[in-house]
């Protein structure tokens, strides 16, 4: 019998990114590569998988020079597992899907304020993962994440459970004007609230509105990545606050019970 393990990293674990801006100016690309591998190996030892066995989608809002239809997903198969270090596997998609035949292969995404959602069909033991920040919510990636399970596994909505990872919460995510990325009006209805000339953005509710599954099947991390000193936060980085800069990771993998 398999079980799904869901985990998150934070700044206590180390930087889950190869972006040069997170490392000392003196670091070469090889220095970054080696430091990053050590972090992944340490995380793998902590949770019980190989740090070389982590896959994430190459998302068009996140990576450069990518395009594909909204909601594109990839079901993990043997062709995705050919490289020794799977972090360097490029899979252009919004969503990754994996079944319980693939054990100890992590699917997830790095993030530093954006929610990552993990949707599990517990009956059919199939899992879908997507990075669902504001841009992705605007183009309905959470909805497509559920749809990927329905298309790939014939999932019943009543069998799907969702985890919404640690992210910036409404009290912290504030604009002084209506955000120009919020172009899909129906998506943001009642999720962007104006208070005293400031706009408070509720990413979590906007995600939940797209899932269409029983509310008691949804687990939400209580962590606000901006306020919690243990988590990397993009907003904190932009504001040049005192927190360390970097990226967290939210992922899931199957293992034997």
Residue ranges and their predicted role:
Residues 1-257:
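Active-site microenvironment for binding and transforming phosphate-containing groups
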